[in-house]
Amino acid sequence: MTLWINGDWITGQGERRRKTNPVSAEILWQGNDANAAQVAEACQVARAAFPRWARQPFAARQAIVEKFAALLEAHKAELTEVIARETGKPRWEAATEVTAMINKIAISIKAYHARTGEQKSELVDGAATLRHRPHGVLAVFGPYNFPGHLPNGHIVPALLAGNTLIFKPSELTPWTGETVIKLWERAGLPAGVLNLVQGGRETGQALSSLDDLDGLLFTGSASTGYQLHRQLSGQPEKILALEMGGNNPLIIEDVANTDAAVHLTLQSAFITAGQRCTCARRLLVKQGAQGDAFLARLVDVAGRLQPGRWDDDPQPFIGGLISAQAAQHVMEAWRQREALGGRTLLAPRKVKEGTSLLTPGIIELTGVADVPDEEVFGPLLNVWRYAHFDEAIRLANNTRFGLSCGLVSTDRAQFEQLLLEARAGIVNWNKPLTGAASTAPFGGIGASGNHRPSAWYAADYCAWPMASLESPELTLPATLSPGLDFSRREAV
């Protein structure tokens, strides 16, 4: 029984699915997808649960969410292992994901009050009050790269706001989704408030096409995000929050400390085996001896990165990709760039055929035409050389995406220029592109999203504002508008 609908664990009636570890092929989870009827049922029970949940005092909803945080803390080791085994990422990194999930609770509560909540201004003859109301029934689509943390970033603020939810994890991480939902169950969520449907494309299409949905919160690829946007076009009454990928540039302008710059680049490009939406995909390096030395050192250190199993001791910097197919896709993208005329500086290599273990790749594409503007979700870094800073900014903005951008430089004025000209929602200076704070909005422009940033701003898309002018008494104004005559006429 792998679906959770209306507080009950039930068996899916759709396609049979199993999840294996992407490195060892160990079977981790087996179950059936939700079929269209079960997806519709999840929506019906969420709709039925909505009025009571929305009318709960905020403190009551907060108490359940805080109980969930306590359960995350108590079961941190267990959830860490589930995430690591299912995604292939090392144990140390999975542990940081669970920590982020725990921290998200307090941050979301603060964001609720700062971004939404209730605000009142006294007027001479009454008050002006701003309140926020939940949308209703929302669908949450989770990704596989952070199968706990990223859905959590939608689910927690949505529940705090008073919405009821249908959660579909990535079909590549069903075990994590199920494990997290079992903690929500123990936290005491009323039946129907949060529902779990497992499945792939068919389940997702059944969910996104429901007429009775009030909105959809999505984290994933640009291609799927565009499909959802088309599917919900002509339905302005539904809230749609799209958090998509990036083809992110990192500019290396002035390298005062070569090893520090190399470390920042490794953290930007290859952490999580390159499977973060903010990962650097394009490395823009200034021409000259300093840039040459930096690239040589980068290739040297990156060439020593050996991906390993989730539980290896000592722990590796990177683990496996989500699947052997994902690793193969990275290899194909590298070969495509070589065929276009790219010069390989570090060839990616499959550590073991049939697994997702893949070493990083670096390829120079300076002067190469028709390089695809796409997000290759893995450890492949494309390099361009440039002559002057204005050219670097032009190259950085030469993408349909707009998620993250970074600069390594000792010149504050260059960073100020980048802030004015960059087309990205996250712009970092001498910090990894993959560094983002939950106390700030997270999102991008262009093909990276639809102007619904998450993290600190997630509260914004989880509730709608209601403005009121209020007075406890009805009185006639002391001064009437021109043309109004309220004088008493004597009876004839």
From Swiss-Prot:
Annotated residues for binding of NAD(+): 220-225
Active site: 243, 277
Keyword Transferase: no
Record keywords, A-Z: Arginine metabolism, NAD, Oxidoreductase
Pfam family, one: Aldedh
Signal peptide positions on this chain: none
EC number: 1.2.1.71
Gene Ontology molecular-function annotations: succinylglutamate-semialdehyde dehydrogenase activity
Reactions performed catalytically: N-succinyl-L-glutamate 5-semialdehyde + NAD(+) + H2O = N-succinyl-L-glutamate + NADH + 2 H(+)
UniProt enzyme class: oxidoreductase
Keyword NAD applies: yes
Any GO BP: arginine catabolic process to succinate
Pathway: Amino-acid degradation; L-arginine degradation via AST pathway; L-glutamate and succinate from L-arginine: step 4/5
Its job: Catalyzes the NAD-dependent reduction of succinylglutamate semialdehyde into succinylglutamate.
PANTHER family linked: ALDEHYDE DEHYDROGENASE-RELATED
Family to which this protein belongs: Belongs to the aldehyde dehydrogenase family. AstD subfamily.
Protein's UniProt name: N-succinylglutamate 5-semialdehyde dehydrogenase
Organism: Salmonella enteritidis PT4 (strain P125109)
